[in-house]
């Protein structure tokens, strides 16, 4: 197996800290962090992808001891968090405060714990978008190429004006088909970068009206006047939410190991 020790290279600006929130509770796939993918728990597969990104320290924010144990057994770093926290962002922030109370890490990257086939380059892309002047938060989006996704409310759209570039400021996020008219639509990818102070402010804010209406946490930041930089990438990573998704992830990683 490849050496996945923490990178020894010179630290990037902001001393990035990658945090992977994970909990056992899942409506459609209970216990999914420990689901076996090619002989390895899914959360360990995600941890490996984050390590392969090479942006800095990686910590799993575990809601349960079983998750933390699996990560530590694989050689990773994990911290236990309150299982009753309301969101992944709150879990990330609690982990940040636990592992870095002195504030050494001023850039935080939030990688979902159900992305075992994630291209590590996407983590670096989120970092690069965040360190642009004026950005409080960064995230990713990809052009929608499947017609059904344009009207699917489970496919969240990032509304931004990319023009000829690959970076744009987020104007809105919605489950609706937006913007109206001819032109591309963008599938939002829930991988985030935060300035540390922006994450602290975000989790301290109450849920906002549009956040509650759309059931999209990132709208809280927009309603509070925070700037979200969106980087356009080529593909949407596979999120494992169902048994069918799990089989797709197993097949994809099995092909990689051949």
UniProtKB/Swiss-Prot annotation:
Activates KDO (a required 8-carbon sugar) for incorporation into bacterial lipopolysaccharide in Gram-negative bacteria. InterPro entries: Cytidylyl_trans, KdsB, Nucleotide-diphossugar_trans. It catalyses: 3-deoxy-alpha-D-manno-oct-2-ulosonate + CTP = CMP-3-deoxy-beta-D-manno-octulosonate + diphosphate. Transmembrane segments: none annotated. Keywords: Cytoplasm, Lipopolysaccharide biosynthesis, Nucleotidyltransferase, Transferase. GO terms for cellular component: cytosol. Belongs to the KdsB family. This is 3-deoxy-manno-octulosonate cytidylyltransferase. It comes from Parvibaculum lavamentivorans (strain DS-1 / DSM 13023 / NCIMB 13966). PANTHER family: 3-DEOXY-MANNO-OCTULOSONATE CYTIDYLYLTRANSFERASE, 3-DEOXY-MANNO-OCTULOSONATE CYTIDYLYLTRANSFERASE, MITOCHONDRIAL. It is found in: Cytoplasm.
């Amino acid at each position: 197996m490849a050496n996945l020790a923490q990178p020894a290279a010179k630290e990037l600006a902001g001393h990035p800290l990658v945090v992977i929130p994970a909990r056992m509770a899942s409506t459609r796939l209970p216990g999914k962090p420990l689901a076996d993918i090619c002989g390895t728990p899914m959360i360990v597969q995600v941890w490996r992808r984050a390590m392969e990104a090479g942006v800095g320290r990686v910590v799993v924010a575990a809601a349960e001891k079983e998750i933390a144990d699996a990560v530590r057994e694989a050689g990773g770093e994990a911290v236990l968090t309150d299982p009753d926290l309301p969101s992944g962002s709150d879990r990330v922030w609690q982990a940040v405060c636990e592992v870095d109370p002195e504030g050494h890490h001023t850039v935080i990257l939030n990688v979902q714990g159900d992305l075992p086939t994630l291209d590590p380059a996407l983590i670096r892309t989120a970092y690069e978008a965040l360190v642009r002047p004026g950005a409080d938060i960064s995230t990713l989006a990809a052009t929608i190429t499947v017609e059904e996704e344009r009207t699917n409310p489970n496919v969240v759209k990032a509304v931004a004006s990319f023009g000829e570039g690959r970076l744009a400021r987020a104007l809105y996020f919605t489950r609706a088909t937006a913007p109206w008219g001819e032109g591309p639509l963008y599938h939002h990818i829930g991988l985030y970068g935060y300035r540390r102070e922006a994450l602290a402010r975000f989790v301290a804010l109450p849920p906002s009206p549009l956040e509650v209406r759309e059931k999209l946490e990132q709208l809280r930041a927009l309603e509070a006047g925070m700037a979200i930089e969106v980087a356009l990438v080529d593909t949407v990573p596979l999120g494992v939410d169902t048994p069918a998704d799990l089989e797709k992830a197993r097949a994809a990683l099995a092909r990689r190991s051949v």
